[in-house]
């Protein structure tokens, strides 16, 4: 029997050094694309997929990530008194049901994937999603929701994947693929940031994952891998042959907001959001 997927882990402990000095006092995940911070794009995507519980693996100085999703009674009372109904409505998306979001500290600095192991008490024996807020995916249907649909049919692990030029394979986790129906691929192996000439394919993994709890026991045993960090790719590879494992070519466009140059790219394609908002702003 395939367990329903209701949990998500978001690794958000990074220092955001690529965005200094902006991230000296503001968490990178609170930087905005149009009218929402990166963290809200990720949470909205997960909630659209039916995910109900969230664990932020965070670090000191990032309390604002939890505060953002808390209720601000003083602010809401002020907006109500001033009859700012549109502003009140905008705040609705920032609320989570009390008791459904928690923050845990990372143990050490072994990289973002070590953070998943730090969420093991939250995960328990349940399947869980991982969303990296650096990746914003514009799609008609939630990207992680597309993976959940595949998971509900196949069980096991499901990764969001996309084709990249061979010369860029050295920057990503790359799949060694088996059966391929054009959308869903069987995963035979995983390689983290291979030399392009040795890459088994050009299918790369993006920051959206659906995993079973089996991966945790492998994360606990791993030594540091590529980049001197514990690599989730290595732990996932050890589950191949023990649980179903698939990659899914998601529908949508992914924007990498983890670097200064790349973070500007979503602003143009997401201008539809501004077009809907600007007339109301000008006329208010």
Swiss-Prot record:
One of its GO terms (molecular function) is UTP:glucose-1-phosphate uridylyltransferase activity. Its EC number is 2.7.7.9. One of its GO terms (biological process) is UDP-alpha-D-glucose metabolic process. Pfam families: NTP_transferase (PF00483). It comes from the Bacteria. It catalyses: alpha-D-glucose 1-phosphate + UTP + H(+) = UDP-alpha-D-glucose + diphosphate. Keywords: Nucleotidyltransferase, Transferase. InterPro entries: GalU_uridylyltTrfase_bac/arc, NTP_transferase_dom, Nucleotide-diphossugar_trans. It is an enzyme of class 2 (transferase). Belongs to the UDPGP type 2 family. This is UTP--glucose-1-phosphate uridylyltransferase. It comes from Komagataeibacter xylinus.
